[in-house]
Amino acid sequence: MGDLTLRCMNCRSLLDIDSSLVDLSMAQRDLLLNSETNTDNSDNNKHNGENDRNIIPQEKLKIINQVKSPSQLRIGQAKNVTAESYVFLTDTEFSLTKFKNNGDEFVDDEDYDERNKTLSSRISALSNIFNILSCKSNIDYPVCQGCCDTLLEKLKEEYNQELKKRDTYHEFMKRIQEQNNSVEIYSDGNKGPKELKNLKREKEELLRQLQELEGENDLLQNDIQTLQSQLKEKQEQQLEQLREKNVQQMEHLSFIKDIQSLKNQRVVTLNHIDSLRKLNIYNETFRISHKGPFGTINELRLGSVPKIQVPWTEINAALGQVVLLLSLIVEKTSLPLPDYNLKPMGSTSVIEKRDLQTDQWFVLKAYGGSEFSLSSLFHKENPIDKALLAILEIIKKLSENVSSNTSEPASIELPYDISDDKINGLSILLKSSSPSLEWTTACKFLLTNIKWLLAFSTSRINKAKP
């Protein structure tokens, strides 16, 4: 039978049809067509027998019984007619084959098996059987052995699920029936007065307990509200305390910062005071130094040489600074200087000298110039020479007075010796000539002695301070 071309309706694989299916008799065909419907009806009758009739009302059972079975429905008639149109029958075969009234069964003559010998008629008859079976179930026939096993497993699983649903439905109906029975029992009006009295007493007791619980609930709600208000108030107090604490800490930090700033300022001020204490104000005010061949006081050159001409205005200003410094030393040291009176007036400073014989005061000009003078022509001297001699005498007397008032006389010795009009052997007199290198060098030595005298005088002034 390998020439048959039927395929599995599920996996579309070729089927090897057994010869017993090809040579089916009419009785065998009727058995195949009616077996599924009868099986379904018998199963439904078995499962839905006594239990359903005990639970389902009679009115619903009548409606269920009036429903037609699948075998009574005309399903697949049009399909069978369509399939039949492809079968070629002989005159004898046409007279033997016809449909019954319900469309689900075939009429077969006794001689059908003997006359139906053609392969096409057999295939057509078998296809009609498969079509009818497919219409009566949810399975498309034919199927192979593998697909058949799969379908059996699936149907078995669905069957078990339906059984579970049925059991659940029965259990639910049973519970409903029990509830209805219990309601009928409790609703029975033949209860005794004692039981009703007990129920009434129990009801009153439950109501009383309910009222007590509601009262306790109200008390608890009030307590909860009170505690919540107290908690909120306490939290606000804590927040306020934290704010105050933060403010205090900020003020404390600011106070510490201010104190530290004041301490730092104090340290800076003390350091500045120490530096000022160590500072010699006289040395800073009168800076005596040298610049080449010239001695300088506050950057003013005292002297002049032929190669470097210094104007008399600068020389006079330097002499004015010398007179101012000597007057300051006399004032701060309180050293006696009865024969001289220093008058610092800048570039026109003068020195007053008392004549011991006549007891008269003479004014000596501590400034000069390049103008022509008759006295310098006849006396061969310059008016500034007397002021320079007076400055030498004042320096010598001040050094002697400082030495007489100190316990270390050797420490007051001047670096350049002063004798009459000479200092370190160089004459301080300018005479009628113009400034020279010798006179400039003598002025330089003069400033050096004044610087030493200033240092000793400053030491004495500092010791005299309280």
From Swiss-Prot:
Main subcellular location: membrane
Cellular component, GO, one term: vacuolar membrane
Compartment(s) of residence: Endosome membrane; Vacuole membrane; Preautophagosomal structure membrane
Keywords noted in UniProt: Autophagy, Coiled coil, Endosome, Membrane, Protein transport, Transport, Vacuole
Topology versus the membrane: Peripheral membrane protein
This protein's record includes keyword Transcription regulation: no
Disruption phenotype: Still forms preautophagosomal structures (PAS) in proximity to the vacuolar membrane.
Location of region: Disordered: 35-55
Purpose: Required for cytoplasm to vacuole transport (Cvt), autophagy, nucleophagy, and mitophagy, as a part of the autophagy-specific VPS34 PI3-kinase complex I. This complex is essential to recruit the ATG8-phosphatidylinositol conjugate and the ATG12-ATG5 conjugate to the pre-autophagosomal structure. Also involved in endosome-to-Golgi retrograde transport as part of the VPS34 PI3-kinase complex II.
Subunit relationships: Component of the autophagy-specific VPS34 PI3-kinase complex I; and of the VPS34 PI3-kinase complex II.
Protein name according to UniProt: Vacuolar protein sorting-associated protein 30
Organism (species): Kluyveromyces marxianus (strain DMKU3-1042 / BCC 29191 / NBRC 104275) (Yeast)
UniProt lineage: Eukaryota, Fungi, Dikarya, Ascomycota, Saccharomycotina
Gene: VPS30
